[in-house]
Every structure is written in structure tokens, then in C-alpha cells.
Amino acid sequence: MAHQQTTTGSSVSSARRGQERGPRRPLRASDVIRKISQILGELLITAGIVLLLFVGWELWWTNVEADAKQTEAVQSFAQDFTGPMTPAAPDAAVDYGPPVVGTAPGYGEMIGIMYVPRFGADYTRPIIEGTDAGVLDTLGLGHYGTTSMPGAVGNFAVAGHRQTHGAVLDNIHTLVPGDKIYVQTADGYYTYVFRNNQIVLPDRTDVLMPVPTQAGVTPKESILTMTSCNPRFGSQERIIAYSTLDGWQPASAGPPSEIAAQVAQAQGKG
Amino acid sequence: MYAWIFRNLPGPLWVRILTCLVLVAAALVLMVQFLFPWFSQFTTLTDSTIGLVQQP
């Protein structure tokens, strides 16, 4: 079969055939080249398939995995959460005083749950202490340990992936000023209102300051800062979303009415 | 290469097909468990933190 296909360079190979004729069919230079190029070709096709599989894994499977882990984290938090699941009073009817500020848990432990109705009626993501890959790649939103806790005067800053591993902040650019962002901790519910966003270079750590981007200024407000990659599917910049604390109610008062259904669902599932 | 592997697998045809499927599945598991998570650090899609705060 191989003999018939070889038409070029037959004079060279016929001269060699005379010298190398042995008990087995002689291995000609063109055979070796064909073998090598076949193996090379198969390896290249394999590499191509592996790369495509990687893209599928990165853009799809990591989300499936992270979603499962985050749902589990939300459920276990909801199970431990004590307090009514229905609002005790209409929103803002009672003033519960200054918000209770919890102490930061250890690395990898759960602070609470974030609800963002703008991101979807079922958007419930865990907030975990720490912002390295071990937290962000599986559990969603990571709290910058150097920043305040929810409700404190100052800056409560969290990071989340724009793409892959749950893509918790994929829709960060869709927030509209006035949108509510709810943070639930063991102490209660903190309602933040989205104020503005900012696109900065990745080294702008000043967005995490107590008063974002203003060094040495004493904070008067409670800010929630969310950071994620920008643009989508890129990382040349960071998109920062700032929200200010609008209200607080203790766990015993029940959830704000807008997220009551989600809070009940999170606990009901557990 | 793959043809050579297939020819050199032991057993009748159906056993060889089964062995191939097991080998492909094993390769997939190894990739998802070890290769892809390792390779993922070279992509930049997951850089969502500011500055060097994420360094352990």
C-alpha cells in the first residue's frame, strides 16, 4: 500500500532499496517521515481537543461546580440562622438603631449571604472571609480582610469573579443607582443602595480605603465596595461598584420584604 | 499512534473498545482534576481582586 502511494523521489529510494534489503520489508526514509508526521499530527489534534476541553471546563464546568458549592454554603448558613423568615414590620417602619457590627471570622469562614435582586430573583451568594483563589474559585464573594465588616462605618469590600467559577459578579455593570443590595449575617440584615461604579487599573488598592480613593479621610458613611474583572472575559481593568448603607434590621425583625421569599427559600431548602 | 495502541491492546475487539473508553475517561478525570486547575492560573479571567491583596 505504501509503495503505491510513493511516487516522488522514487529514484533515491530504489537506490537505497538495493543496499538495505534484508529479511523484513526495508524501512525507507519516506516511511519514517510518514510515521513521524502521523504521530505529530495525532498529537497536535489531541492538543487541540484538550485545549477545547479546557475552554469548556473553564467557562462552563467551573460554574456548575461553584454553583453547587455556593448553594450548599448558603443552605448551611440558613440552617444555622435563627430568626423569623417573614418581615415583622413594614420596611423602615421601625428604627433599630445603629447596626450591629460582627467580628470578622477566620479565613475561609462564612460571613453571610448577599442578595442582589438586580442580578436575578434567585441571586443568593455566600460571602466568605478571604480573597485568594481558594475562596473566590469555589465559594463566590470574598471579603477583603483589611476592610470593615458589614454595617461598620468605613468600607466593607468584597471581590467576586466576573467569569468562571460561579461568575458571581457577571452582571455588576447592570446595577442602576438606587438598586438595593442586601447582606444577611448572623446579626441581621444590612440594606445597601448602589451609588456608582468606577473602572480602574488593577493596582488601585485605594478603592479599598475607608473612604474609597481618599487617603487619610475619616469615614462617616458605611460603604459596600464590590470589585471584579473588567472587561467581561478580560482582566486589563477592574470594575468597582460602590453602595452606601441605607438601613439595618436585626435578625429577630425578619428580612426586608423584597428578599423575604428568597430568605425563606434558602432556609426551606436546607 | 492511536491505531498502534488499539492494535496492541489485549483481548477481543469488544474488550479493546471497552479498554479504550476507560482510558479516555481516565484521561478526562486527570485533566479535570489536575491539568485544568493548574493551567487555569495562567489565564487572567479570574483576576477579580485589587492590587496584591489576594496574595496569601
Q: Across the structure, where does each feature detected by a protein language model lie?
A:
Chain A
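Solvent-exposed, non-transmembrane regions of membrane-associated and secreted proteins
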Residues: V32, Q38-I39, I49-G270
